[in-house]
Amino acid sequence: EEQEWAGPEALCPGWLEDEALDGEVPGHSGDPEGATHAYERLQSTLCQEGLPPTLDCSAEPCTGFGPLDMTVCILGSPTPFLPVLLEGGTRCPGAMVLCLSPSWASRVPSESSPGSWSLLLSRGVSFKAGGHSALETFVPPRRANYVTGTFGDPEGGWVGELARDLDCPTGGSVPLAHRLQDTLVARWVLAARANLPVPPTLAFVLGARGDLPDEPPAPGVRLVRLQDPQCQQSLVQEEVGAFLGGAAMEPYSQVVVRPAGWRWWGTGTRSTHRKEEGAAVAQAVGARLRGLTEEDSVLLEAMVPTARLPLPPPRSPAPRLPMALRICTLVCRSWGDRPQLCQVACTVGRAESPVRHGAALPQGLDSTLQQWGVVAPSQRQALATRLREATEAAMAALLATEAELSPQQRGGARAHTDILGVDFLLACVDDALELVALATNSQRCLETCVLAEAMGRGVGEPRGDLPRLLAEAMLHRAQCHLVEGKDILLIGAGGVSKSFVWEAARDYGLRIHLVESDPEHFAAGLVQTFLPYDSREHRWDEEHAERVLELLRSRGLRPHACLSYWDDCVVLAALVCQGLGLRGPAPAAVRVAKQKSRTHGHLQRSPAAFAVPCRRLQSHGDVERAVAAVPFPAVAKLEFGAGAVGVRLVENAAQCHAHAARLWRDLRDDADHPGIGLGWGNAMLLMEYVPGTEHDVDLVVFEGRLLGAWVSDNGPTRVPAFLETAACLPSCLPADRQAQLVRAALECCRACGLRDGVFNVELKLGPAGPRLLEINPRMGGFYLRDWIREVYGPDLLLAAVLVALGVPPVLPARPAPRTHLAGVMCLGSEHGEALA
């Protein structure tokens, strides 16, 4: 039976009936590109959401947009992306701009990427906090840092043309959308690259079809390459017969014949047949092959029924109709290019018809599984976990496949699929529930999930994560583009433990100008400019700063930002920042944080009891005076130390004298042990021993405002030297105790004057709350950057660069760990023989 499902799907938000509230777009009478209709749709949707109408500010051009102003541009229909625009407008007011017409934008040759284009916006609807929006003109035009849009909309051809071959990250393109809309290509990716079950499929294609390689094989998909379908009818009949009689078709009684390819996407053109009707099936396939083009295919596939589970007795004697379930998932390319499931929505329909997007109102996964007879909560949770894993595997496979395409095939060197919809059905295979992947899309799942979230808010459900996750991903990619080509002055290269800096700088496109004391440092060949200058005697950092400024002037260097990741150089970096007029922590604040006794002495005046009693030691006389003020047991360590070198638990004055004598004898200057602060001298500190568990808190602070915080746990330290033994992330502490640590770390930084930067704070948590050990006025060292990136996604290095540029980093508002890491410390002196 031939079935045609064509035309608008009225329940999807993209096809809502619009009311014209304000008539034509201000200043765009008779707009031929449909901007008026799109603008009216935007106003109607804002009204339905209870938000104010767009304010027309186009008469007064907006000026002053520079290279550090972020612009995320959405091209095309406003409806699918409206929640994302509103969320992004709240997170970064004015950064999200909606472009409704090709006349609002222009393409100019890229200055940074030959052969590419920059997208300039002369007009757009920008979104602010509180759901406010404004129609604005931009003089000079704003340069887009990230572009996406409704590439799958057949009426939006101008969207694809504007977004083609751009020099900024582009979330999709028309060629990529066409690949997603081609059911055969999608199933090949899902089966061959993601190892997901798909309906048994026999596909006939014309010619070589290079987008469908023979390797790796796609389980469940049989590909037949035809040269002339009219002359190969016997081959077609043989393949159809073998498919219908094959083992893969044994569980199924019906098949579907349909054309596939992006031109056929959404038409619903298909015919359904019983498996026994071999002649009719072959005839239907042959009829479709007559009009086959090289971009299309003809599919013969099993009609996989939705699993039927035992249900409780019905309340009504009325017969139960067989139903079908479609599971719609939306996944985005999140931090570190990792797939992240954003939302799931289900639609239910009659079993004899395909359940399509927009044919029914969406509902939640958990309630749908309950309705289907999955009673046990643990089984429903297991299915939800499998669905997340399958969806994210599909996205990972798609990204890997796209990476193998040429820039022309992708629609640009910077074009990638950032938002992916994957449809599944719940089948029963060998008496077990199985998620079968059906198809992919670039827009329909987004619309369905947006509708599901709006419906939830209508009955008092809290806002979901979908708009936040998508807005954060877009803003993050825009910020990555924002830092490309920026000149960063780095003070101090550090050791091998900082090798990741050079790799990250290359990946982010940073131009590093390095000031380093070692003229033979390995990083000299990895940076844009190497400036050897011996600054190891840090007690003269004011003079060093003047010399560094002279070096920059002599080279004609004007960096956009200056910072240091190396503990010894943080004060010098702050002084150079001040001399250049760049953003960074004040030198006085860094000095307070760098010198441990000054840190605690400064914080003693604070009403919050985070500081620990301590005394500075420069002589044995100081030791005698300190033991009268600091109770034993106590901790003796270097005043400016790093890496726990020289730290020791002392039980009495004699042990303190002995430890101080050893340190003052063996550690005199930087040559004795580079990188542990001896350039500041070898003064010591005696501080009260604080019981409790030890933790690191890594903070991102911008203008005194906390943007991000991550708590990690340290295992019990090995006394008396307090060597770190283990660590884990995320913290095992309950949320309220982590909140105590974060608040204490933030208050300590603020009290010291550290208002801009990425800082690492070491604390102990006892029964009475947090106590400060020390503040490191730089990014957390050793494993912390890599671990935070692996577990949560954000990169502390990028965050530090953005803060130094004067741009508040976009970080996850509700960070959720993607994995758990635990590590055991191994030292060459202790474990070298065992590990050899």
PLM regions: where:
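ATP-dependent carboxylate activation and anion-phosphoryl transfer catalytic cores
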Residues: 1-61, 316-317, 335-339, 350-486, ...
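Conserved hydrophobic helix-helix packing surfaces used for dimerization/oligomerization
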Residues: 69-72, 487-489
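Short N-terminal binding/cap micro-motifs at the start of the first secondary-structure element
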Residues: 80-84, 448, 496-501
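Phosphate-binding site of ATP-dependent enzymes
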Residues: 249-253, 271-374, 660-717, 733-746, ...
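Active-site nucleotide/adenylate-binding loops and adjacent lid/helix of ATP-dependent enzymes
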Residues: 1-4, 8-16, 20, 28-29, ...
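N-terminal basic/disordered segments at the start of proteins
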Residues: 492-508
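Conserved N-proximal alpha/beta basic substrate-recognition cap immediately N-terminal to
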Residues: 8, 18, 36-49, 78-246, ...
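Short, polar loop motifs at secondary-structure junctions
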Residues: 102-104, 515-521
